[in-house]
């Protein structure tokens, strides 16, 4: 037996040597295949887009988002996808750190803490080439994101800067350049491509046209007021309808930019080995949208496509996932170790068609948008209800922000003088109440605050208890204040500290 074993070993060795000698010229290709086995990662975001502005998520405007809809057919659509903080920079930095803003240091529009580990940092160490297109200044400090490709900074006179992250053909051109870099370097890629549509200024407005050296609408189309739908959380009056048409024109232009990115990926030949994640950073910049804690603030049109892994055309309406889960999910997908302090949890099992426990509640936060102004809010959502606590609502402090600077808010203020229903909505938006409760199953637009309805007393108690539990889990510094909210001066003292903190945050107002 021993002799036969030695003979077998010799024969196997000779066969191996022959094989290596005969195919030595192909060894580099074998090495490339092993490297390419690790998937590329493409994160695509849009700026200030409400979830149901997308055809695949319920928008009825014909032809509004054909490219996003096509992506949904190729992957999995999440009907309970959320972001955790409904303002640009904190939302985006949470996605790439797996941490709430109060844990990564970016509560307002300021750089996060230098000791926080980012997703591109970990991918860079694993051999990825990293790139970013659009919203570049919202990843700070810049060195923590390890960008290899950032034409916004490296090509200061380039057409990319002149396009302001809103030109579809530019996304195609610059994405293709990056994909070629990946192929030339023989490195898997990580690209974050961020359309700055449909952020204000909306497409076709005078401010939008003046921000370009050419007409950006030459690559898109302009929707008319009679072609669009006004969401139920806004009054359907002429000025609102006019601005909503401009918003939807921006939504469509964003979709064309996404189409450019996906076209470049397809033509690069790397699409079959690429994980694609699509989402919005927060809801639209209208009253009761962005910079709040409502359904239309935090729900995002989340889509994940991964050829050969995610079953095309699937829909998950059961599990709640959020922005802080993105980094853990990507790390799980590419088999890299997790950060032990992460707030988020991987939802890779869902992408593989499995069920997952502890995916029913989502905790959302809000801190500030403009410098020196803070409106701290917290919310907990389950599959039906949402409970919101507004630390700032004292009956005197008035809400202001990105949503109160446009035509819609001005029109609402004017209409409120004669229309009591609009006046009620305006007044509530400005001053709010400390607590809010909504039945999103029957009232997704948060039109009826149920906090004082005795029929929901038990539900309110459960959600208050859940809020405390989640605040502990996510190390929210507002925990003790919320717990002791009914004690004298607790809220007022907390708000004094918030105002002091606001003086040193929110410096980066290019949101």
Predicted regions and their residues:
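Formylglycine-dependent sulfatase
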Residues: 2-4, 20-436, 444-465, 469-472, ...
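Bacterial N-terminal signal peptides
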Residues: 10-21
């Amino acid at each position: 037996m021993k002799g036969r074993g030695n003979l077998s070993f010799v024969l196997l060795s000779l066969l191996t040597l022959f094989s290596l000698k005969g195919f030595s010229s192909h060894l580099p290709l074998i090495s490339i295949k092993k490297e390419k086995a690790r998937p590329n990662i493409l994160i695509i975001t849009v700026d200030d887009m409400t979830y149901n502005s997308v055809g695949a998520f319920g928008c009825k405007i014909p032809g509004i988002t054909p490219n996003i809809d096509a992506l949904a057919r190729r992957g999995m659509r999440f009907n309970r996808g959320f972001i955790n903080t409904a303002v640009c920079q904190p939302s985006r930095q949470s996605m790439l750190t797996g941490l709430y803003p109060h844990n990564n240091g970016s509560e307002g529009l300021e750089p996060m803490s230098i000791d926080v580990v980012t997703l591109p940092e970990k991918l860079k160490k694993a051999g990825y080439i990293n790139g970013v297109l659009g919203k570049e200044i919202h990843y700070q400090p810049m060195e923590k994101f390890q960008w290899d490709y950032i034409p916004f900074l490296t090509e200061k006179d380039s057409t990319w800067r002149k396009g302001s992250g809103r030109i579809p053909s530019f996304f195609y051109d610059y994405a293709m350049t990056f994909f070629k870099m990946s192929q030339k370097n023989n490195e898997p890629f990580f690209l974050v491509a961020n359309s700055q549509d449909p952020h204000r200024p909306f497409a076709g407005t005078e401010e939008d046209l003046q921000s370009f050296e050419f007409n950006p609408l030459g690559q898109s189309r302009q929707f008319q007021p009679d072609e669009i739908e006004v969401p139920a959380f806004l009054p359907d009056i002429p000025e609102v309808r006019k601005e909503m048409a401009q918003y939807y024109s921006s939504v469509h232009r964003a979709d064309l930019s996404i189409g450019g990115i996906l076209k470049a990926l397809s033509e690069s030949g790397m699409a079959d080995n690429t994980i694609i994640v699509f989402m919005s950073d927060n809801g639209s910049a209208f009253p009761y949208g962005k910079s709040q804690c409502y359904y239309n603030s935090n729900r995002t049109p989340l889509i994940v496509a991964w050829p050969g892994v995610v079953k095309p055309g699937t829909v998950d309406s059961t599990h709640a996932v959020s922005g802080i889960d993105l980094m853990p999910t990507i790390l799980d997908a590419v088999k890299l170790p997790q950060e032990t302090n992460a707030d988020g949890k991987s939802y890779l099992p869902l992408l593989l068609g499995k069920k997952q426990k502890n995916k029913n509640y989502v905790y959302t936060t809000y801190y500030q948008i403009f410098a020196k102004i803070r409106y701290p809010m917290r919310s907990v959502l389950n599959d039906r209800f949402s409970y919101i606590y507004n630390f700032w609502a004292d009956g005197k402090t008035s809400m202001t922000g990105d949503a109160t600077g446009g035509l819609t808010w001005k029109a609402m203020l004017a209409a409120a003088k004669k229309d009591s229903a609009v006046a009620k909505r305006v007044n509530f938006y400005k001053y709010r109440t400390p607590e809010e409760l909504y039945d999103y199953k029957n009232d997704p637009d948060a039109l009826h605050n149920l906090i004082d309805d005795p029929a929901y007393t038990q539900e309110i108690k459960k959600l208050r208890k859940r809020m405390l539990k989640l605040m502990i889990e996510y190390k929210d510094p507002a925990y003790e204040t919320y717990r002791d909210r009914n004690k004298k001066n607790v809220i007022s003292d907390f708000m004094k500290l918030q105002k002091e903190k606001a003086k040193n945050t929110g410096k980066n107002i290019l949101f």
